[in-house]
Regions:
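Collagen/collagen-like triple-helix sequence repeat recognition
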Residues: 1-64
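Conserved RNA-binding domains used in RNP assembly and mRNA/RNA metabolism
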Residues: 56-221
Length: 221
C-alpha cells in the first residue's frame, strides 16, 4: 500500500562537548599612552667634585695704595712739569721741588725724583713712604685717572682702616684737615675719593693735595 506521512521531529539531543580552542588571532593596534606616573624620589647626592685651583692672592692694601700713588705721580709729572710740589712723608719730613721722574723707569718704580727749576735732580723720595703730594699754585686737573679697586680686593685690618677713611670722606666733604706724621698734610674739600687716595683742594679746586688713605692718621671735618 502507499507510504505513510512523515512522523513529527524528535526532541533535540544534548549539546555536544566544546571543540578545541582555535588559533590566536593577529595582535591588535597599540593602545594610547597612559598618563605619566608620579615623580620618583630624589636620588642620593653624588660625591663632591675635586677642589678647584687656588684663586689669585689679594694684594696687601699697603701695596695697593703705593700702586695708586705711583699711578697718580706718573700723571702729575706730565700735567704739572713746571709747578712746585710739596711731598709730605709719613715720618713728618717734607721735600719740595718739581716732579721729575719715577725711578727706576718702568712699572715697578719705587722712587720719586725731584728736580729744581732748571731740571737738575735733587733728592729722591720713597713712594712707599709718601703721605701726600700737594701741587702749589695750580688747580686740580680733571684729566687725572685712577686705578679701580684691585681684584680680588685687599682684606684684613689694614684694608678695613683704609676703607673706613674713604667712607668717612665722601666727595663734597668740606672743612677737612688730614694729619700724618705729626703734621697737617692737606686741608680743604674732598674733590675725589678713590681706592687708596683722596684728593683735597682749596677754593676753586686750587692747591690739590693727593693723600694716601693708607697714611692718613688724624682726620678733622
Amino acid at each position: 500500500g502507499p507510504m505513510g506521512a512523515t512522523g513529527p521531529a524528535g526532541t533535540a539531543g544534548e549539546t555536544g562537548p566544546t571543540g578545541p580552542q582555535g588559533p590566536s588571532g593577529p595582535t591588535g593596534p597599540q593602545g594610547r599612552d597612559g598618563a605619566p606616573g608620579s615623580t620618583g624620589p630624589v636620588g642620593a647626592t653624588g660625591p663632591a667634585g675635586p677642589t678647584g685651583p687656588t684663586g689669585p692672592t689679594a694684594a696687601a692694601v699697603g701695596c695697593a695704595c703705593v700702586q695708586q700713588m705711583r699711578n697718580v705721580l706718573q700723571q702729575l709729572i706730565q700735567l704739572y712739569p713746571n709747578d712746585n710740589a710739596v711731598v709730605a712723608m709719613d715720618s713728618g719730613n717734607n721735600s719740595s721741588g718739581r716732579l721729575g721722574s719715577l725711578l727706576p723707569a718702568g712699572p715697578n718704580a719705587g722712587l720719586l725724583q725731584l728736580v729744581n727749576s732748571q731740571g737738575v735732580p735733587q733728592e729722591a723720595v720713597s713712594i712707599c713712604r709718601i703721605a701726600s703730594v700737594r701741587i702749589t699754585s695750580a688747580s686740580y686737573n680733571n684729566a687725572i685717572t685712577y686705578l679701580p679697586v684691585p681684584v680680588p680686593p685687599p682684606t684684613g685690618c689694614d684694608a678695613d682702616c683704609e676703607a673706613a677713611i674713604r667712607s668717612y670722606l665722601p666727595v663734597g666733604t668740606t672743612g677737612v684737615a688730614i694729619n700724618a706724621g705729626g703734621q697737617t698734610v692737606a686741608n680743604g674739600s674732598i674733590i675725589r675719593n678713590e681706592f687708596g687716595m683722596v684728593v683735597v683742594v682749596g677754593p676753586n679746586s686750587s692747591d690739590p693735595a693727593f693723600v694716601s688713605t693708607c697714611k692718613a692718621e688724624i682726620i678733622n671735618q
